[in-house]
UniProtKB/Swiss-Prot annotation:
Lineage per the UniProt record: Bacteria, Pseudomonadati, Pseudomonadota, Gammaproteobacteria, Alteromonadales
Origin superkingdom: Bacteria
Protein name (record): 6,7-dimethyl-8-ribityllumazine synthase
EC number: 2.5.1.78
Species whose genome carries this gene: Shewanella sp. (strain W3-18-1)
Cysteines paired by S-S bonds: none
Alphabetical keyword list: Riboflavin biosynthesis, Transferase
Gene that specifies this protein: ribH
Coiled coil ranges: none
Cross-referenced CDD domains: Lumazine_synthase-I
Length: 158
């Protein structure tokens, strides 16, 4: 039996973090979590990390697509926070953001980690950005590091 799995160390990985400015008090904590994880666990150097800031979650897929098309990165982390309000706007924004980022990953055969909070309340978002429920930015970075290595392993073995 052949088992393919990745580890989380990726010293030479070039990573782009595409981050929404909307709800910045939350997403800055997600960014801190992602950066800490990339550096501490992945051993990724500052020189290999590029942060791209966009206005909101809807803009994340387009920026991620441009980053992917450059061919300069091994993976992308998308960070943002979409909080449900009293209108259907949440469903459109969260759904299109998720779908667009998945499309980028498949189109460019590049890992795109989804670190976009989609919560019903501001309290839930706060919990997921570094308090009770961990830091989803850090979790997205772990996922990305592992997928970078999994795809490299697959390329070597297949």
């Amino acid at each position: 039996m052949n088992i393919v799995q990745g580890n989380i160390e990726a010293k030479n990985a070039k990573v782009a973090i595409v981050i929404s400015r909307f709800n910045s008090f939350l997403v800055e904590s997600l960014l801190e979590g992602a950066l800490d994880t990339l550096k501490r666990f992945g051993q990724v150097s500052d020189d290999n990390i590029t942060v791209v800031r966009v206005p909101g979650a809807v803009e994340l897929p387009l920026a991620a697509r441009r980053v992917a098309a450059s061919g300069k990165f091994d993976g992308i982390i998308a960070l943002g926070a979409v909080i449900r309000g009293g209108t259907p706007h949440f469903d459109f924004v969260a759904g299109e953001c998720n779908k667009g980022l998945a499309q980028v990953a498949l189109e460019f055969d590049l890992p795109v980690a989804f670190g976009v909070l989609t919560t019903d309340t501001i309290e839930q978002a706060i919990e997921r950005s570094g308090t009770k429920a961990g830091n989803k930015g850090g979790e997205a970075a772990l996922s990305l590091l592992e997928m970078v290595n999994v795809l490299q392993e697959l390329e070597q073995q297949l």
